[in-house]
From Swiss-Prot:
Keyword set, alphabetical order: Cytoplasm, Exonuclease, Hydrolase, Nuclease
Domain of life: Bacteria
Enzyme Commission number(s) of this protein: 3.1.11.6
SUPFAM superfamilies from the UniProt entry: XseB-like
Catalysis: reaction(s): Exonucleolytic cleavage in either 5'- to 3'- or 3'- to 5'-direction to yield nucleoside 5'-phosphates
Species assigned in the record: Rickettsia felis (strain ATCC VR-1525 / URRWXCal2) (Rickettsia azadi)
Name under which the protein is recorded: Exodeoxyribonuclease 7 small subunit
PANTHER family: EXODEOXYRIBONUCLEASE 7 SMALL SUBUNIT
GO cellular component terms listed in the entry, alphabetical order: cytosol; exodeoxyribonuclease VII complex
Biological processes annotated in GO: DNA catabolic process
Similarity remark: Belongs to the XseB family.
Subcellular location(s) per record: Cytoplasm
Length: 80
């Protein structure tokens, strides 16, 4: 886990969510130092934002696919 101010764009939704869940468990556990907990919280915010971005992208893609399929009845691979 890195505590940088940015998040690698290539991290998958599933990886980010798993790391976020681990951070929540550690913070809830209460065994981390204050500084470590704050750094973990900061990383958690980055991961949450990344997950929200990935979900939004997926939703928009699904909406696009649905509109194309509804309007034409045919969906070409190049349209997606």
């Amino acid at each position: 886990m890195t505590n940088t101010k940015t998040l690698e764009e290539n991290i998958s939704f599933e990886e980010a969510l798993k790391e976020l869940e681990e951070i929540v468990k550690k913070i809830d556990n209460g065994q981390e130092s204050l500084e470590t907990a704050v750094n973990s919280f900061e990383r958690g915010i980055l991961l949450k934002n990344h997950c929200e971005k990935k979900l939004k992208e997926a939703r928009l893609k699904i909406e696009k696919i649905t509109k194309l399929a509804d309007s034409t009845g045919v969906l070409e691979e190049t349209e997606v």
